[in-house]
Amino acid sequence: MIKTILFDLDGTLLNTIDDLADAANWVCTQHGWPTFPVETYKHFVGNGIPKLVERFSPENARTPEQLAATLAEFSARYDAHKEDKTAPYPGILELLAALKAEGFQTAVFSNKADAFCGKIIEHYFGPDSFSLVRGSRPGVPTKPDPAGVYSLMADLGADPQSTLFVGDSDVDILTGHNAGLPALGVLWGFRGEAELTAAGADALAAKPEDILAYLRCEKH
C-alpha cells in the first residue's frame, strides 16, 4: 500500500517553463545566440540546469569554462525572475490538501538545483507543505540515477514497497523504476502520453485528482 509520494517539480507540481525559457532566451540574446520557442524548452529541461544550459548554448560556446560562466549568468537571471509566470497546475493545491488529509507523506525530488527548489516550493506552497524537498546537490547523481531517491527515502523512513514516484517525463518514470518504485506519469506537464507510455509508466493521470483515485484504488 502506498504511503509516501515523491513528486517531480517542474512540469508536475509547477508550470515553470515560461520563466525557464525567458531566462534562457535572455542569456542567448545577451550573447547574440539564437533563441528558442517555449515548446523547444520543454525538451531541453528535465536533466538539471547545467544540461539545460548546455542545450541552449551553441556548439562553439560549450567549453567547460564557457558553460560554467553561462550557468552562473542563467542562474542569476532565473533566480531574479523565477516567479514571474510560474504557477501551480490547476488542481495541485487541492490534491496536496487531500493527500495530507488522508495521511499520505509527500516529498519533492527534482533535478533543479537544491537552492531553487527550496525557495520556489516555499513561495508557492508554504514552508510545511512537504515532509522534504530535495533538489540537485553536488556529489549526488541527478535523475534517473536512483541514488538521490534512496537517500530521500532513508530520510523519510520510507521503503520502495510503499512509495510512489510521480512525474511528467521519461526521466521521472526511469527514476522511479531504477529505485524499485512504481511510477505514475502526469499528462499536463512538459512531455506527453507517448513518452510516458514508452518509458513504462505504471499509470497515467490526466488531471491531479486522478492521482488520488489511483492511490485510493491501491488501498483496496
Predicted features and spans:
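Substrate-recognition "cap/lid" segment bordering the active-site pocket of phosphatases
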Residues: 84-87, 113-166, 170-179, 193-195
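Alpha-helical substrate-recognition element adjacent to the catalytic core
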Residues: 30-60, 90
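Short, acidic loop-to-helix structural element flanking the phosphoryl-transfer center
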Residues: 80-108, 114-118, 146
